[in-house]
Amino acid sequence: MANRETVVKRLVSAVNQIHRWVDIVFPELRQVFKILTCKGALETLRLFPLPADLSKLEPNDVIAGWKKSMKRHSGVRRAKLLIELAKQTVGSSQATQAYKLHLEHLLEEYDLANTQLRRIEAEAKTVLERIPYAAKILAIIGISAIALAGVLGESGDLSGLYPRKHTAASRRP
């Protein structure tokens, strides 16, 4: 589970850096996508990384790009708003190639950390299936598989613990 913590830190770092990049290069993107890590926002950043790229397009071009990677795209209204905001952006227009390369690296890091996190969590759930008492603990409302895997990873095997009744009886004088 220490590995999971490292991957989560990398994922959070990548998300924060993407937010910073958007604040510098295309701050108006937040008016179109409230959550920058939603699929639509990430695909927009992948397909049209710079406002200058977007400002040259028509709404149908943006929608065609979205359709290639998403089953449900954001719609004509959002595409029009995105293009209008790209034309009026107050973001940095200097060193655009460097910003574009930086964004590509940030998105790759985000994707890698996301993939690794999914693999780690799937493996943790697989391991929990082999632990006989894990299903009973997971039946408790509020305990997730990942939380239980973390507890068991830190504490070890809990099967040797005595039941509460037995422990209370042994304390009597």
Residue ranges and their predicted role:
Residues M1-P173:
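A detector of single, family-specific signature residues
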